[in-house]
Amino acid sequence: MAERTTSGTPAKRSVRRRFSRRKGCRFCADNTLKIDYKEIRNLRYFITERGKIVPRRISGNCAEHQRKIREAIKRARNIALLPFTAGHSLD
């Protein structure tokens, strides 16, 4: 049964949205990390198992470094260091 208020109308439940703490950009935090299309091990963290580039809101990158990651992944794909689609092993 639905809860009812004194006026007889159904009560509205307050829905709380849970926001996780914003991840910091790992490249801004550690200046020794470089984005290079030849470093496949670093680029793997920014690609899903289906071969898609992980969005900024999930990876936690800042806009500048997300653009650099995107370009590095595209370069690595063009010279066959990374797969375009799923089903190809990265090893």
UniProtKB/Swiss-Prot annotation:
Keywords linked to the UniProt accession: Ribonucleoprotein, Ribosomal protein, RNA-binding, rRNA-binding
Signal peptide start-end: none
Xref: PROSITE patterns: RIBOSOMAL_S18
A single cellular component GO annotation: cytosolic small ribosomal subunit
InterPro entries on file: Ribosomal_bS18, Ribosomal_bS18_CS, Ribosomal_bS18_sf
Any single biological process term in GO: translation
One Pfam short name: Ribosomal_S18
Gene Ontology MF term list: small ribosomal subunit rRNA binding; structural constituent of ribosome
Gene3D superfamilies: Ribosomal protein S18
Domain of life the protein comes from: Bacteria
Description of how the protein assembles with itself and partners: Part of the 30S ribosomal subunit. Forms a tight heterodimer with protein bS6.
Family: Belongs to the bacterial ribosomal protein bS18 family.
Entries under PANTHER family matching the protein: 30S RIBOSOMAL PROTEIN S18, SMALL RIBOSOMAL SUBUNIT PROTEIN BS18M
Function in brief: Binds as a heterodimer with protein bS6 to the central domain of the 16S rRNA, where it helps stabilize the platform of the 30S subunit.
NCBIfam families to which the protein is assigned, alphabetical: S18
Name recorded for this polypeptide: Small ribosomal subunit protein bS18
Species the sequence originates in: Syntrophotalea carbinolica (strain DSM 2380 / NBRC 103641 / GraBd1) (Pelobacter carbinolicus)
Gene: rpsR
